[in-house]
A protein has these predicted regions:
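ABC ATPase NBD coupling module
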Residues: 59, 112-129
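Helix-to-loop junction immediately C-terminal to a conserved catalytic motif
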Residues: 95
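Conserved ABC transporter NBD signature motif
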Residues: 103-111
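Short coil-to-helix segment of the ABC ATPase nucleotide-binding domain corresponding to the Q-loop/switch region
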Residues: 142-150
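Conserved ABC ATPase signature
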Residues: 183-187, 191
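A short, proline-enriched helix->beta-strand linker immediately N-terminal to the Walker B motif
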Residues: 202-206
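Catalytic Walker B motif of ABC-type/P-loop ATPase nucleotide-binding domains
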Residues: 208-211
Length: 346
C-alpha cells in the first residue's frame, strides 16, 4: 500500500467529524466480520441508526444522530456524556418510554420501535426495571420498604403472602434485611436508592436501567451502590445500563460508552472482558476502532474510538489540540499499516 493514503475526508456540518474511506481495509474488515458472524452471540439489545428529533412550533433539536449500539446479556455498562449529549434520550428509547424518529431497536428479539403499545407495556412490565435519580420518582413516602417493593407485583396473580415474600427477598439482595417495615422518610438517601433497586428487580427483569443512581448521594454511598451494582450483575446475571455523570463508575463496569452530539464517540472496555471477547470472536464488536491512551484507566480498561458505518470517527477537542489541529483540514496517510492524521501545516 502506498504511503500516500487516498481518502475522502469531508466535514460533517452536524457533528464536525471526519469521514475516512479506505476501501481495501473496509473489504478486509467486512470479510472478518462475516467470518465471525456465526460465532457472535445475538445481542440482547441492538440499536441501528437511531435518530431522535424533538420538535416545537419554532425549533427542532436532534438528540440522537444515527446512533448504533449493541448490548449483550449480562453486561454492566455505564453511559456517560455531557448534558444534552443524548444519553438520557437513549435510555428512554432503550426502555420503550420513547420511540425513535428513525432507525430501529431490537430487544430480546422484539422490534420494540415497531410493536403495539400493549406489547410494549408487557415488555416494560416484565422484562425491564427502572431506577430514577430522584427518590420521589421511585418510592411512595407513605408506604414501608416492603410495600414499595410489592407495588410492581400488585397486578400479578400472586397472593399477598407470595408478594410479600418476593419483596423481602429483593430487599435482602440489596442489603436491607433490617428495613422491611421502615418508611423512606426514616432512611438515608443510599438506603432509599436500595429500596428503589429492590423494586426494580423484584420481578426478575432481564434489563435494569438506571438514570443517575448515584447523583444525589455522597462519595461513600456512591461507592457502596457501585459495589451493589456489580454484585447484582454477577449474582443474578441481570444486564445493567447506567446513565451517569459519575466518572468513578468507570472502574466498576464492564464497558463505558461515551456519547457526544447524539452519537457514541468512544468506548472503554474492561481488559479482562475485552481479552475474553477477542479470544472468543477473533475480533471486537462492530464499530470499535483504534486504541487510545488513558493514564487514569490504563490498568483496568482498553479504550477505543468508534468508527461508524459511514467510516466517520470523532476526534475530541482535546485530541485535536494535542495534535495541533486547528482547522477543518487534516493530512491523512497510511504508514506501516496505520492511519496517521496530521494537521495541515505539517
Amino acid at each position: 500500500m502506498s504511503s500516500e493514503f487516498e481518502s475522502n475526508t469531508t466535514e460533517n456540518p452536524i457533528d464536525n467529524t471526519a469521514v475516512i474511506s479506505a476501501d481495501s481495509d473496509t473489504t478486509q474488515t467486512n470479510t472478518a466480520d462475516s467470518n465471525n458472524a456465526d460465532k457472535k452471540e445475538e445481542p440482547l439489545i441492538h440499536c441501528d441508526n437511531l435518530v431522535k428529533i424533538y420538535k416545537t412550533s419554532d425549533i427542532e433539536v436532534m438528540a440522537l444522530q444515527g446512533l448504533d449500539f449493541d448490548v449483550h446479556k449480562g453486561e454492566l455498562i455505564a453511559i456517560i456524556g455531557k448534558s444534552g449529549s443524548g444519553k438520557s434520550t437513549l435510555l428512554n428509547i432503550l426502555g420503550g418510554l420513547e420511540k425513535p424518529t428513525a432507525g430501529y431497536i431490537m430487544f430480546d428479539g422484539d422490534m420494540i420501535s415497531e410493536i403495539s403499545q400493549k406489547e410494549l407495556c408487557e415488555i416494560r412490565s416484565n422484562k425491564i426495571g427502572y431506577v430514577w435519580q430522584k427518590n420521589t420518582d421511585n418510592l411512595l413516602q407513605y408506604l414501608t420498604a416492603v410495600q414499595n417493593v410489592e407495588m410492581p407485583l400488585l397486578f400479578s396473580n400472586l397472593s399477598k403472602k407470595e408478594r410479600e415474600q418476593m419483596a423481602k427477598e429483593a430487599l435482602d439482595k440489596v442489603g436491607l434485611s433490617e428495613k422491611y417495615n421502615s418508611f423512606p422518610t426514616s432512611m438515608s438517601g443510599g438506603e432509599q436508592q436500595r429500596v428503589a433497586i429492590a423494586a426494580a428487580i423484584v420481578k426478575k427483569p432481564e434489563l435494569l436501567l438506571m438514570d443517575e443512581p448515584t447523583g444525589a448521594v455522597d462519595k461513600r454511598t456512591s461507592d457502596n451502590l457501585q459495589q451493589l451494582f456489580r454484585k447484582l450483575n454477577k449474582e443474578t446475571g441481570i444486564t445493567i445500563i447506567i446513565v451517569t455523570h459519575d466518572i468513578s463508575l468507570a472502574d466498576n463496569v464492564d464497558r463505558v460508552v461515551m456519547i457526544s452530539d447524539g452519537k457514541i464517540s468512544s468506548e472503554r472496555i474492561l481488559k479482562e472482558r475485552y481479552n475474553s471477547i477477542k479470544n472468543e470472536n477473533g475480533s471486537l464488536a462492530d464499530g470499535i476502532g483504534g486504541n487510545t491512551e488513558n493514564s487514569e484507566d490504563e490498568s483496568t480498561h482498553e479504550e477505543f474510538m468508534i468508527l461508524d458505518k459511514a467510516g466517520r470517527v470523532r476526534l475530541s477537542p482535546e485530541m485535536q489540540e494535542a495534535a495541533g489541529i486547528n482547522s477543518n483540514r487534516v493530512r491523512i496517510e497510511v504508514e506501516d499499516g496505520k492511519i496517521v492524521i496530521r494537521s495541515e501545516d505539517e
